[in-house]
């Protein structure tokens, strides 16, 4: 049976882990959200989130975006390649409802799976 937990080892926690992804990322994005990814040697994917107060003013909106993103990652973690992902929220992401945000994330996860497989 597949475990769908979200333990600590599936998260990017330190600034150096985020910097690793920002140095040479593969990008997949929409006007409201971008997911940066970089292959890791751990054998499983990890995720980090950046939702700036400058782009999403209200705390409850930032929390909603982070919660939906974590849930999307948690459900797809076994389909994703062994990469470190950083999800960057841009202006306008707060205007998306839950369904639109979930659909955008699913599309970006699929795109990263294709990018990881190569040409």
Swiss-Prot record:
Supply one GO BP term.
tRNA 5'-leader removal
Q: Which reaction does it catalyse?
A: Endonucleolytic cleavage of RNA, removing 5'-extranucleotides from tRNA precursor
State the Gene3D superfamilies in the record: 3.30.230.10
Instruction: Identify the enzyme class.
Output: hydrolase
- List the SUPFAM superfamilies hit by this protein, alphabetically: Ribosomal protein S5 domain 2-like
This protein's UniProt keywords: Endonuclease, Hydrolase, Nuclease, RNA-binding, tRNA processing
One GO cellular component term of this record is: ribonuclease P complex
| EC number annotated for this UniProt entry | 3.1.26.5
Q: Name one GO molecular function term.
A: ribonuclease P activity
Quaternary context: Consists of a catalytic RNA component (M1 or rnpB) and a protein subunit.
Q: Which family does it belong to?
A: Belongs to the RnpA family.
Described purpose of this protein according to its UniProt entry: RNaseP catalyzes the removal of the 5'-leader sequence from pre-tRNA to produce the mature 5'-terminus. It can also cleave other RNA substrates such as 4.5S RNA. The protein component plays an auxiliary but essential role in vivo by binding to the 5'-leader sequence and broadening the substrate specificity of the ribozyme.
> What NCBIfam families does this protein map onto?
rnpA (TIGR00188)
Tell me what this protein is called: Ribonuclease P protein component
- Which gene does this sequence derive from? rnpA
């Amino acid at each position: 049976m597949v475990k769908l937990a979200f333990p600590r080892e599936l998260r990017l926690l330190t600034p150096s882990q985020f910097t690793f992804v920002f140095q040479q990322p593969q990008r997949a994005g929409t006007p409201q959200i971008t997911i940066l990814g970089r292959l890791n040697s751990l054998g499983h994917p990890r995720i980090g989130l950046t939702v700036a107060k400058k782009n999403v003013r209200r705390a409850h909106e930032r929390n909603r975006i982070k919660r939906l993103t974590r849930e999307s990652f948690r459900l797809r973690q076994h389909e994703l390649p062994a990469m470190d992902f950083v999800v960057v929220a841009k202006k306008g992401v707060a205007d998306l409802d839950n369904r639109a945000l979930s659909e955008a994330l699913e599309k970006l996860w699929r795109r990263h799976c294709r990018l990881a497989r190569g040409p």
